C-alpha cells in the first residue's frame, strides 16, 4: 500500500509539473501559438509598436487619431466608424460555427450588440474576407479584398463607411490593433484534454497534429449568403416570431444605429416609431421592411450613408419574424 501511495504521489507530482510548465495555456493567443508550431505567417503579419496599437484602437473606435506628425488625423468617414457595424469581442459561443440563434443568445448573455458585420476578434487568423455573396453588392471590388486583409480594410473604409482611403500608417496601425485582439485558446473552447493534447503533440515533434487540432476550432472565413424578402409580405417567412427575442434584436441591432444621436438620420426610439415600422412590412416589395433588411440600401448622390444588409448568417428568417412580432406588439399596444 505504501508503494502504491508513493507511485500515485509521484505521478501526481509529474502531472502537476507538466500542467505548470505547459507551453500553451488558456491565455495563449491563437496566432502566436500557430506560428510557434511552424504555421506560415499571413501577408498581413506585422511587427508592431505599442504606439501603433493605441493609434489603431483610436482609429477603430473614434475614426481618427494623432498621426506621426503629432497632429489630429482626418476622420476616415464622416458617417460611420468601425464599431457602427463590427464588434471587437468574441460574439459566437463556438467560433467554429456561424449560427445567428446561438449568437443572439450569446449577445444577450454578454450584453453586446448584434450586428450585420463579423467581429474583429480573431480577424487576423481568418484567411478570406468579403466572402460568399458580397460580390453581388460590391462587384469586382471584392476580388482584391478576398485574400488580402489590407485590401479588405480599405474596401470597408471607402465603400462600406463611404469614407476615404486609409494612409499607409493608418492601415498598419489598425493591423497592429487587430493583432492584439486575436482569439485566446480559452475563447476557442479547448477542453482540458485538448489543451493537454496540444502541448503533448508540440513537445514530441508533432506540430502538424497540433496545428490541425487548433484549426478545427475557428472559422477561417465568415460565410455570407444573401436571401430574398418573402414572396408574400403579409404572410412573411414561414417561421413564427417571438416578440421577446424580437425586442432583443431591436435593441441590440436596430437601435445600435437608429437611436437618438445615432449614426442614422432615422431614429426609432419612440412608441410612434413602431406604427411607422409596422406599416413598412406591407409596402411595395422593393421598399418593404423585409427588403431593407435583406437588401440594405445603397449610397446615392446627396445621401451617401447607407444601411448594410443582413445575410442569413447574421440574421435568420426566424429572427426577422421575431423582430416583426415585437414591432407589431408595440404598434398595437
Predicted regions and their residues:
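Sec-dependent N-terminal signal peptides
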Residues: 4-12
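Electrostatic cytochrome c docking/interface patches
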Residues: 32-75, 199-251, 265
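Axial heme c-ligation environment in periplasmic c-type cytochrome domains
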Residues: 38-43, 68-76, 120-174, 269-275, ...
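Secretory-pathway/luminal and periplasmic proteins that interact with or process carbohydrate-rich
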Residues: 66-68, 89-96, 181-188, 333
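Gly/Gly-Pro-rich "capping" loops immediately C-terminal to redox-active cysteine motifs
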Residues: 72-145, 259-292, 309
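Ser/Thr/Pro-rich, low-complexity mucin-like regions
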Residues: 167-189
